[in-house]
């Protein structure tokens, strides 16, 4: 697999389209950090790490509104292995005028656009979530 983060986002997008309660993805440190951001920003209910004597599995519990409205409207991969996209500290993008979240890989770890702006760091723009 050439782009595991794109696979992670696609699995969430596909499960969200058919209103699945949970989705399982192969685990990694980056995916765990992305799941933590999704949870903290209120896009998923929870996630758990399952040990399987290999790389492990992340089980994400998706969140829906009272009338089955999707909380995650869209996920978009920005920086991919063939075309890396970087943003300086003053050029950090806003997603939908601040309604969405940009996930940025910085020297201080994987942060949301708001946290990166507050800490004054730039980095690689991984994805947009809205």
From Swiss-Prot:
Keywords: Ribonucleoprotein, Ribosomal protein, RNA-binding, rRNA-binding. GO terms for molecular function: rRNA binding; structural constituent of ribosome. SUPFAM superfamilies: Ribosomal protein S8. GO terms for biological process: translation. Pfam families: Ribosomal_S8. Part of the 30S ribosomal subunit. Contacts proteins S5 and S12. PANTHER family: 40S RIBOSOMAL PROTEIN S15A. Belongs to the universal ribosomal protein uS8 family. One of the primary rRNA binding proteins, it binds directly to 16S rRNA central domain where it helps coordinate assembly of the platform of the 30S subunit. This is Small ribosomal subunit protein uS8. It comes from Moorella thermoacetica (strain ATCC 39073 / JCM 9320). The gene is rpsH.
């Amino acid at each position: 697999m050439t782009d595991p983060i794109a696979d992670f986002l696609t699995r969430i997008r596909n499960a969200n389209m058919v209103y699945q309660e949970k989705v399982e993805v192969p685990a990694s440190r980056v995916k765990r950090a992305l799941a933590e951001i999704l949870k903290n920003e209120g896009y998923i209910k929870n996630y758990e790490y399952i040990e399987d004597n290999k790389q492990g599995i992340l089980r994400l519990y998706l969140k829906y509104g009272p009338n089955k409205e999707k909380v995650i409207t869209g996920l978009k991969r920005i920086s991919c292995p063939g075309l890396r996209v970087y943003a300086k500290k003053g050029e950090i993008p806003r997603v939908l005028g601040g309604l969405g979240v940009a996930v940025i890989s910085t020297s201080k770890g994987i942060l949301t656009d708001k946290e990166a702006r507050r800490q004054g760091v730039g980095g690689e723009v991984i994805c947009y979530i809205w």
